[in-house]
Amino acid sequence: MADLELETIGRVRLARLNRPDKKNAQSEEMLDLLSAALREADEDPAVGCFVITGAGDAFCSGGDLGRRSKEQEARDPTPLERKERLAKVSQRVARAVELFEKPLIAAVNGAAVGAGMDMALMCDFRVAGASARFSEGYIRVGLLPGNGGCYFLPRIVGMPKALELLWTGDFVDADEALRLGMVNHVYPDAELMTRTLALAQRIADGPPVQLRDIKKLTYQAQHTDLRTSLESVSAHMAVVQSTEDYKEAIKAFKEKRKPVFKGR
């Protein structure tokens, strides 16, 4: 049984972390498969949105510390080897996400801890089941947030709260995560995937070029001034107004029907 299951539902690609007996602790196979799935979905015109969730009653409990301990007992790696392994193995999904141009959603069921919380944070947004719990638990095992926690968390909840959560490793339940802006919606556990997939499908049904441009422009705007952002939007606007999908949207509006977008 593979450590990651993939399913296509309409225009949504669903990736399910699949080590439920280990609370979906990350394995090298899982990270390999997920990073490859992201690259493939980004190139597939039939995919409009990507959703990550976990099998069983957990989203992801972080890295597989048991497996890591056995490997280190067999051979103690040098500091350089540790650094290179972190970059090439543990961080490969974060690097794939950085290049992913389509909408990316985390559907958090149960616990998201350490690298599991980081995986949720690196998505464009998160929705949660009522039983979801989040913890940057690295501090409890003497580690640093190695998969983007120091980068993503302050941008979502602000620096003071991020530092508190990183320093303490405290758990945040679903309602508190909603209050902090860590998740956009909290659904009953039994409805999490149905409602997440409905939302993902609504997004995926949008015009593909415009979806990608909105994501790119919104992220770029976090690192530039207003004038530069407006100029960039203007340049992209000139392009999208020449697309068939723009013309289809205007025609559908006039005809009072749902537009059919083709990504061109």
Please identify what each model-predicted range represents.
Residues 95-211, 238, 242-251, 257, ...:
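Crotonase-fold acyl-CoA enzyme core
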Residues 29-33, 89, 96, 195, ...:
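Charged catalytic carboxylate motif
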Residues 215-224:
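Short, charged, surface-exposed hinge/linker loops at domain edges
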Residues 15, 19, 34, 52, ...:
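Terminal peptide-recognition signature
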Residues 54-96, 112, 225:
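Glycine- (often His-adjacent) and acidic-residue-rich active-site loop
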Residues 1-55, 71:
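Conserved CoA-thioester-binding segment of acyl-CoA-metabolizing enzymes
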